């Protein structure tokens, strides 16, 4: 999940680390032709448009639709959910992104999309007077900013605000979004720690109900808060879940469900066919699906949020579930209540206890940890190694993070239309 300079410091998340040694996909000479478009009264001359196929039209979801994800791990990677992005605009790509229920908005490693003549590790190349670049259905603005990830291990991505359609999935089924804001990053600062490395990691596919933000240096927040990211944005702006930019038909509710994923095989996601697809993501919900879940209403807008009530056509809601009771029994015992985030982007369980809590500072492996949501749903697991590794931040008084371990045995849903979260 994202922790930015504008988010509540109590909101804690998973480790997010990336190397910039990505392999740039081979692109035909035709696809490499570029159109530089002058905008906003700029004086630069525009070159001839690139001859390319138009972006794929947005997919309409009329029934709950299963899309493959690629859960995996390796000797150098913690267990991670991966969604394959197969095109950005009309540019064919093969970009494994972390499917992240703990953050909102999409970040894309620019060097895997654009030719070296357009972007380097220092940034995008704009001709004199140019304020935007149009490339095969992708718009890159000259708004430079950052997105920040992590807590103990922190990274800061540097890039530009852009706009494009995204196609994700694989040969078994794909979904194309409407045109949406994306963050096209070209470099990453590693403030501390280590973690996922490119070319395995190419960015984040954030699907949380909340807001994310692209921070622009020198921005002054208006009284009513920053706005949603648009082609007119010149300062810090908000992005939201990629799943909110899907065309949902009248027969379904906007949102998604994740099915249990017990297997995170060791494989190489960069080698085609090496990692097995798993049909764990269902796009679009209906009453039959939701009726079997224990649900709670989301807090909309998030506590402390100042900005548009709706972005992308749906309410901006808090990803933290308030008043979750967490208890340990067995070798370690104790109970506390806090906010909790169910986060596919965290490879362990992070328990942030209140100041003065009687909850133990360490959960001994073999102890049972249980969580009870306000809806009465209870989830339990046995603390141990791997995704069951349980880290206690004694007295941190922030949100607890319920990571990948939950998703190995249980279902999870987010309904953007009704602003509901569900478990079973």
Language-model segments: residues:
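N-terminal secretory signal peptides that target proteins for export/translocation
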Residues: 1-20
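Sec-dependent signal peptide recognition
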Residues: 23-29
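C-terminal motif of bacterial Sec signal peptides marking the signal peptidase cleavage site
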Residues: 35-38
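Pepsin/retropepsin-fold aspartyl endopeptidases
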Residues: 40-424
């Amino acid at each position: 999940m994202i922790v930015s300079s504008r988010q509540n410091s109590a909101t804690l998340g998973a480790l997010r680390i990336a190397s910039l040694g990505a392999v740039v996909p081979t692109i035909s000479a035709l696809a490499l032709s570029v159109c530089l478009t002058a905008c906003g009264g700029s004086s630069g001359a525009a070159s001839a448009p690139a001859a390319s196929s138009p972006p794929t039209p947005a997919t309409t979801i009329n029934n709950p639709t299963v899309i493959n994800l690629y859960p995996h791990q390796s000797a150098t990677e913690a267990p991670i959910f991966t969604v394959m992005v197969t095109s950005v605009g009309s540019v064919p790509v093969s970009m494994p992104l972390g499917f992240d229920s703990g953050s909102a908005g999409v970040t894309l490693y620019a060097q895997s999309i654009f030719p070296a003549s357009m972007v380097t590790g220092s940034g995008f190349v704009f001709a004199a007077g140019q304020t935007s670049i149009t490339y095969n259905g992708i718009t890159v603005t000259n708004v430079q900013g950052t997105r920040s990830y992590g807590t103990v291990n922190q990274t800061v991505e540097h890039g530009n605000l852009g706009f494009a359609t995204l196609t994700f999935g694989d040969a078994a089924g794909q979904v194309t979004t409407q045109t949406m804001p994306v963050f096209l990053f070209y470099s990453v600062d590693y403030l501390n720690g280590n973690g996922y490395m490119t070319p395995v990691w190419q960015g984040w596919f954030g699907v949380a109900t909340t807001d994310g933000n692209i921070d622009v240096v020198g921005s002054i927040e208006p009284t009513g808060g920053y706005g949603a990211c648009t082609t007119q944005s010149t300062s810090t702006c908000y992005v939201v879940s990629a799943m909110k930019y899907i065309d949902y038909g009248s027969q379904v509710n906007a949102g998604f469900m994740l099915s249990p994923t017990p297997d995170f095989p060791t494989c190489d996601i960069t080698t085609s066919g090496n990692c097995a697809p798993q049909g764990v993501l269902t796009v679009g919900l209906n009453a039959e699906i939701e009726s079997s879940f224990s649900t709670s209403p989301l807090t909309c807008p998030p506590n402390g949020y100042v900005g548009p009530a709706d972005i992308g056509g749906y309410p901006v809601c808090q990803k933290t579930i308030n008043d979750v009771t967490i208890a340990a029994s067995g070798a370690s015992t104790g109970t506390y209540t806090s906010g909790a985030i169910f986060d596919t982007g965290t490879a362990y369980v992070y328990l942030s206890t209140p100041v003065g809590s009687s909850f133990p500072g360490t959960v001994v492996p073999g102890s049972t940890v249980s969580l009870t949501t306000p809806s009465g749903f209870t989830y339990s697991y046995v603390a141990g190694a791997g995704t069951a590794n349980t880290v206690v931040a004694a007295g941190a008084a922030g949100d607890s993070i319920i990571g990948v371990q939950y998703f190995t045995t249980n279902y999870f849903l987010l309904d953007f239309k009704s602003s509901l979260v569900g478990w079973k």
